[in-house]
From Swiss-Prot:
Ion transport is among the record's keywords: no
Gene responsible for this protein: atpsckmt
Subcellular location: Mitochondrion membrane
Protein name stated in the entry: ATP synthase subunit C lysine N-methyltransferase
Primary location: mitochondrion
InterPro entries the UniProt entry points to: FAM173A/B, SAM-dependent_MTases_sf
Species per Swiss-Prot/TrEMBL record: Xenopus laevis (African clawed frog)
Segments passing through the bilayer: 35-55
Region (Required for mitochondrial location): 48-82
Domain of life: Eukaryota
SUPFAM superfamilies: S-adenosyl-L-methionine-dependent methyltransferases
Keyword S-adenosyl-L-methionine among record annotations: yes
Length: 226
């Protein structure tokens, strides 16, 4: 066989091998693209509910409470009765801890993934009969029936939440603010240090002080007009 014929045969064999390998490469490329694309979509679907609330105006970002914060909240609930509600309950640790102390406890959370996870945790820890978790916007919920309110707030939402709770809560209610205090209310108790600090507000005592201030201001006005 001449040299030219050998070269021609080699080229034909290479062409056949190349043509048969291309579909396989193309197939694997499509599969890889599909897997990567599906993974990204799944990650987006899972991550979006966690990230979105933090980006919305006047909503609570998910920042888990520390062990010390949970203990400080429970100390402020000692000798209290009635239902405990956690506004922006996150992964449910405050609600579950309160239930373990004998309270009926409720959590409101905008993120459905966190609500489902909280329900699972409550079931796993044996307190699901004493807990309730709801997917809800805190601004659309009335808290008038609750005697013990826990809130892990952020500074920009505290003034508006202060007005809402002052309007809705009864005199027997106690509000426990974590991480940030309310701007106008005077706390009855302050416990802890740094990010673990909690501020406790008893609505009955607060309203008595407010009423006395209003009476005093009216007397001042009358004195100036006499």
């Amino acid at each position: 066989m001449s040299k030219s014929r050998k070269e021609s045969k080699s080229l034909e064999e290479y062409s056949i091998v190349s043509s048969t390998s291309r579909p396989k490469k193309k197939k694997w490329g499509l599969v890889a693209t599909g897997v990567i694309g599906g993974t990204l979509v799944a990650l987006y679907a899972v991550a979006t509910p966690f990230v979105a609330p933090a980006l919305r105006k006047l909503c609570l970002p998910y920042v888990p409470a520390t062990t010390t914060q949970v203990k400080n909240v429970l100390k402020m609930l000692r000798s209290r009765t009635g239902i405990v509600v956690d506004i922006g309950s996150g992964d449910g640790r405050i609600v579950i801890a309160a239930a373990k102390e004998g309270f009926q406890a409720v959590g409101y959370e905008l993120n459905p993934w966190l609500v489902w996870y909280s329900r699972f945790r409550a079931w796993r820890e044996g307190v699901h009969h004493h807990t309730r978790f709801y997917v809800s916007d805190l601004w659309k919920v009335s808290f008038s029936r609750y005697r013990n309110v826990v809130i892990f707030g952020v500074p920009q939402m505290m003034p508006q939440l202060e007005k809402k709770l002052q309007t809705e809560l009864q005199d027997a209610a106690r509000v426990i603010a974590c991480r940030f205090p309310f701007p106008n209310w005077v706390p009855d108790h302050i416990f802890g240090e740094g990010v673990d600090t909690v501020w406790t507000y008893d609505l009955g005592a607060f309203r008595k002080v407010s009423d006395l201030k209003q009476v005093a201001s009216k007397h001042c006005i009358l004195d100036t007009t006499v």
